[in-house]
């Protein structure tokens, strides 16, 4: 077995690793192994071009300079696809290296809010599956129930130091449905034990999946990102091995070259131009994979069955929730009990005795206005509020509400890798198109005609889409446009490649006219576009359904703000009305 056959077998080894890398621990190991295998195969192909090994099918000339012998590796269809796979494996290695488990984009403070969010969902479907820790008192006081969100947000530092102290009244809060005032509903509090309904097995399993630990959930998201980005390699590696094998040998022995070297493409700019275009196109594949995994994660994690419209109509209620700050658990179901109040009473807002109704209205208006301006939406940032204590200014950081939106599990830091790959794509495409235009101007002498060449048009369309993606990723309100443009850019690159390599378009310097290869690329283009559009349409449909809960979200967020201030001041509960 010659050394060239070893290089050929390393290509299949890289293909095998590309199929099984997800089972490696950590994932960066599998991505690195696939990258080195494909790099070894590409170097073996280059070693066939440099010594003018005429036994290779793609080596036609023997008198080209050394620099153009190297560039001859990607000057044919098989070599260009091999370079495409090598760049793709390198980008995948960078993505796995940046997405290691210790650098997850799930913030700690977001995890606490997610716990409260899942508790909200569990109360909404009357299946409280979250078993929160009980902080038993060492004294004779009754046991109390806390959530991590309450411990960090609702309860002040001074109040947390003496959390074993009971309140005069309960801090349990209910949000009743004004659409169905005739229905009386009772809900279990956070952590209460209720029998599990067998008919809701799927719903329970999904919520259990959502209520996992932060590290486990972050690891799952990380695997989805890597799987979405490197899944493109599962197509190009078989395509390279099956229909575009660069290591095909001649059936006869050649001692003389079949053709003389063409002096026209022998230009340094022409040799650098194709790798830049390939690097830009493959960078769009990384953005495509990240957005695809983000859409799939958003459909699973954010649009669960309890959040659907039919579930809301079935239960006939808005978001019903309970936030326990320090109430007693008297039975399996919570009942509101107020001191010096009759037995029959309706739940009401906790009102501070030292606060006027005007102050409450101002606070409620602030909550509503902040919601429309985006201040209440959790984007991983917290608003600093100036607090004057004992005559000194103290800057404390306090979130205004819990997350209930498009990024419950993944914070806005997830946009950073997408932004990096968009900039990488646009930069390489700019350099490649600029070099190609310069070479055409001083070599062909046709100037602007170069941009009417189908090959350059195929690379110019992703560049325009990359410019649009930069503008959409900068604005935080255009997440759907960012996802849509990312899933459109890669099919645009694949469609241009398939049109040129199938012979549908005949450019000046085309080197591939095989119809079977073009049909293979077209099938991949249709499959990828169809799956992406289905995912995007489902995401938009679920987002449109979620807009119907805007009023309910306003109520829940504003009441949480009020509950936080009430918990800090240890209010004396006052009923607004009673029977």
Curated annotation (Swiss-Prot):
<dbReference type="GO" id="GO:0005739">
    <property type="term" value="C:mitochondrion"/>
</dbReference>
<dbReference type="InterPro" id="IPR003569">
    <property type="entry name" value="Cyt_c_biogenesis_plant"/>
</dbReference>
<dbReference type="GO" id="GO:0015232">
    <property type="term" value="F:heme transmembrane transporter activity"/>
</dbReference>
<dbReference type="GO" id="GO:0016020">
    <property type="term" value="C:membrane"/>
</dbReference>
<keyword id="KW-0201">Cytochrome c-type biogenesis</keyword>
<dbReference type="GO" id="GO:0017004">
    <property type="term" value="P:cytochrome complex assembly"/>
</dbReference>
<dbReference type="GO" id="GO:0020037">
    <property type="term" value="F:heme binding"/>
</dbReference>
<comment type="similarity">
    <text>Belongs to the CcmF/CycK/Ccl1/NrfE/CcsA family.</text>
</comment>
<dbReference type="Pfam" id="PF01578">
    <property type="entry name" value="Cytochrom_C_asm"/>
</dbReference>
<protein>
    <recommendedName>
        <fullName>Probable cytochrome c biosynthesis protein</fullName>
    </recommendedName>
</protein>
<dbReference type="InterPro" id="IPR002541">
    <property type="entry name" value="Cyt_c_assembly"/>
</dbReference>
<dbReference type="InterPro" id="IPR003567">
    <property type="entry name" value="Cyt_c_biogenesis"/>
</dbReference>
<comment type="function">
    <text>Could be involved in assembly and maturation of cytochromes c. May play a role in guidance of apocytochromes and heme groups for the covalent linkage introduced by the cytochrome-c-heme lyase.</text>
</comment>
<keyword id="KW-0496">Mitochondrion</keyword>
């Amino acid at each position: 077995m010659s050394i060239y056959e070893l290089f050929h077998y390393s290509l299949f080894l890289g293909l095998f690793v590309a199929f099984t890398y997800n089972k490696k621990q950590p994932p960066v190991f599998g991505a690195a192994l696939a990258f080195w295998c494909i790099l070894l195969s590409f170097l073996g192909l280059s070693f066939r071009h440099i010594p003018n090994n005429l036994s290779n099918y793609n080596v036609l000339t023997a008198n080209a300079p050394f620099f153009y012998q190297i560039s001859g590796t990607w000057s044919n269809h098989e070599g260009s696809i091999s370079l495409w796979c090598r760049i793709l494996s390198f980008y995948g290695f960078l993505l796995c290296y940046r997405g290691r488990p210790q650098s997850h984009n799930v913030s700690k403070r977001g995890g606490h809010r997610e716990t409260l969010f899942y508790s909200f969902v569990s109360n909404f479907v009357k299946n409280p599956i979250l078993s929160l820790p009980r902080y038993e008192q060492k004294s004779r006081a009754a046991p109390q129930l806390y959530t991590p969100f309450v411990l960090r947000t609702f309860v002040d530092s001074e109040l947390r130091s003496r959390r074993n102290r009971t309140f005069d009244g309960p801090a349990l809060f209910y949000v009743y449905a004004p659409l169905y005032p005739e229905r009386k509903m009772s809900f279990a509090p956070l952590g209460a034990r209720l029998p599990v309904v067998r008919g809701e097995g799927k719903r329970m399993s999904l919520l259990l999946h959502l209520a996992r630990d932060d590290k486990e959930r972050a690891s799952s998201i990380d695997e989805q990102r890597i799987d979405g980005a490197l899944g493109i390699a599962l197509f190009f590696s078989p395509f390279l091995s099956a229909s575009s094998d660069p290591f095909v040998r001649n059936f006869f022995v050649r001692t003389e070259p079949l053709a003389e070297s063409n002096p026209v493409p022998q230009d340094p700019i022409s040799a650098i131009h194709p790798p830049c275009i390939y690097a830009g196109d493959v960078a769009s594949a990384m953005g495509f994979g990240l957005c695809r995994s983000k859409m799939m994660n958003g459909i699973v994690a954010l649009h669960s069955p309890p959040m659907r419209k039919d579930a809301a109509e079935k239960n006939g209620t808005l978001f019903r929730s309970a936030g326990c700050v320090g109430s007693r658990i008297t039975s399996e179901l919570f009942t509101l009990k107020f001191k010096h109040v009759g037995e029959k009473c309706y739940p009401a807002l906790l009102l501070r005795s030292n606060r006027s109704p005007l102050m409450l209205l101002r606070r409620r208006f602030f909550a509503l206005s902040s919601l429309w301006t985006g201040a209440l939406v959790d984007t991983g940032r917290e608003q600093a509020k100036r607090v004057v204590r004992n005559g000194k200014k103290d800057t404390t950081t306090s979130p205004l509400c819990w997350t209930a939106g498009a990024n419950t599990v993944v914070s806005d830091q997830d946009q950073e890798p997408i932004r990096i790959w968009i900039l990488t794509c646009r930069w390489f495409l700019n350099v490649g198109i600029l070099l190609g235009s310069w070479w055409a101007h001083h070599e062909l002498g046709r100037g602007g005609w170069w941009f009417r060449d189908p090959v350059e048009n195929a690379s110019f369309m992703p560049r325009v889409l990359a410019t649009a993606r930069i503008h959409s990723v900068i604005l935080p309100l255009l997440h759907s446009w960012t996802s849509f443009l990312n899933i459109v850019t890669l099919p645009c690159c694949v469609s241009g490649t398939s049109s040129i390599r199938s012979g549908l378009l005949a450019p000046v310097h085309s080197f591939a006219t095989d119809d079977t290869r073009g049909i293979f690329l077209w099938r991949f283009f249709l499959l990828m576009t169809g799956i992406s559009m289905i995912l995007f349409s489902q995401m938009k449909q679920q987002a449109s359904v979620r807009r119907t809960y805007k009023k309910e979200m306003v109520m829940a967020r504003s009441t949480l703000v009020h509950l936080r201030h009430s918990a800090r001041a240890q209010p004396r509960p006052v009923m607004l009305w009673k029977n």
